[in-house]
Amino acid sequence: MNLIALLEQEEIKRLTGDKPVTEFAPGDTVIVSVNVVEGTRKRVQAFEGVVIAKRNRGLNSAFIVRKISSGEAVERTFQLYSPQIASIEVKRRGDVRRAKLYYLRNRSGKSARIKEKLVSKQANHQAQG
């Protein structure tokens, strides 16, 4: 392993601390809690939407979340290991066949829906036991 990769790994470990990073994939509906500083106040703002892309590049990993807010589409890019992200919660798993869902930008309404991924009984049993 080269020196840069080693340093990136240490930095990821420092940024995540003891909390593991939530596993999610494109097509999943997630709620990203973001720390927002307004003057002297610090609050947590939730951004809920569909993950349309995920970029796995070590420390530079990022993902794009798309939501429809009062009829207008909003896309926001988040750095995965950013200190501004308080938490990432997966609300629903999506069943998609693509890694990048940019085609959703051209669709609206029912055509932009994503099927829910059904978990098999065997996988469910392993998770519980």
UniProtKB/Swiss-Prot annotation:
InterPro entries named in the record: Ribosomal_bL19 (IPR001857), Ribosomal_bL19_CS (IPR018257), Ribosomal_bL19_sf (IPR038657), Translation_prot_SH3-like_sf (IPR008991)
Family in the record: Belongs to the bacterial ribosomal protein bL19 family.
Keywords carried by this UniProt record: Ribonucleoprotein, Ribosomal protein
Molecular function via GO: structural constituent of ribosome
Organism: Bordetella avium (strain 197N)
One family name in Pfam for this protein: Ribosomal_L19
UniProt key word Nuclease: no
Protein name as annotated: Large ribosomal subunit protein bL19
Keyword match Transmembrane helix: no
